[in-house]
């Protein structure tokens, strides 16, 4: 019987922390059979970072060069990512527990095709501005889990985290977003536990 692999999309603007999030999560979730697909426009930079820094072997990481608009590769024409998923499935005999699929850095409106992924995480960072949650981008609104990263930078960029929380609560439930600082692992455990409970249904 073929195992049901959960595909988790990870989206967010350039520099928000998508790749670092995957590096942290794959280390913490090493009890599972994991693989990662990264999307970059013209390089495989994120895949190379994970191959060097994560706990995954290189054959568990595929870098997709999307060219053009990264949004298209996760929604309108996701053929390259479908192909990468199938490659990983065949490589590991359809026995993977989770495939994380990281989008290329894109704008606040970027969303994944529901045919491509089962669940989505969208991540922004405080340095992009306190007003980002107020902009109500579809990536934030439609994702299953929303992360606000780099909380340590708030005093330096004049961002009020309480205001960001209030603005986020206009669009999301309290239990579906988490503040993080991935550089020092703040709340990474909470993100992992949220994924295990809500995406992998481990508590059922």
From Swiss-Prot:
Domain of life: Bacteria
Residues that, per the record, bind GTP: 12-19
Record's GO cellular component terms: cytoplasm
Record CDD domains: UreG
Pfam families, sorted: cobW
Key word Calcium present: no
Cited InterPro entries: CobW/HypB/UreG_nucleotide-bd, P-loop_NTPase, UreG
Subcellular location: Cytoplasm
Function description: Facilitates the functional incorporation of the urease nickel metallocenter. This process requires GTP hydrolysis, probably effectuated by UreG.
Family listed: Belongs to the SIMIBI class G3E GTPase family. UreG subfamily.
Description of how the protein assembles with itself and partners: Homodimer. UreD, UreF and UreG form a complex that acts as a GTP-hydrolysis-dependent molecular chaperone, activating the urease apoprotein by helping to assemble the nickel containing metallocenter of UreC. The UreE protein probably delivers the nickel.
Protein name, entry field: Urease accessory protein UreG
Source organism (scientific name): Streptococcus thermophilus (strain ATCC BAA-250 / LMG 18311)
């Amino acid at each position: 019987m073929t195992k049901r692999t959960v595909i988790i999309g990870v989206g967010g603007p350039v520099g928000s922390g998508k790749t670092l999030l995957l590096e942290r999560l794959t280390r913490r979730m090493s009890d599972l059979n994991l693989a990662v697909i990264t999307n970059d426009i013209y390089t495989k930079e994120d895949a190379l970072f994970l191959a060097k820094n994560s706990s995954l072997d290189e054959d568990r990481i595929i870098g997709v060069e999307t060219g053009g608009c990264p949004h298209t590769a996760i929604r309108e024409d996701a053929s390259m990512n479908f192909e990468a998923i199938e490659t990983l499935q065949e490589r590991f005999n359809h026995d993977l527990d989770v495939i994380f699929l990281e989008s290329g850095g894109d704008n606040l409106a970027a969303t994944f095709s529901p045919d491509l992924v089962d669940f989505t995480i969208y991540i922004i960072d405080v340095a992009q501005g306190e007003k980002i949650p107020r902009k109500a981008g579809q990536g934030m609104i439609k994702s299953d889990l929303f992360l606000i990263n780099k909380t340590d930078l708030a005093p330096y960029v004049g961002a009020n985290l309480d205001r960001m929380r209030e603005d986020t609560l206009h669009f999301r439930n309290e239990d579906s977003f988490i503040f993080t600082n991935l550089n020092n692992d703040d709340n990474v455990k909470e993100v992992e536990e949220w994924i295990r409970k809500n995406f992998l249904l481990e508590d059922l």
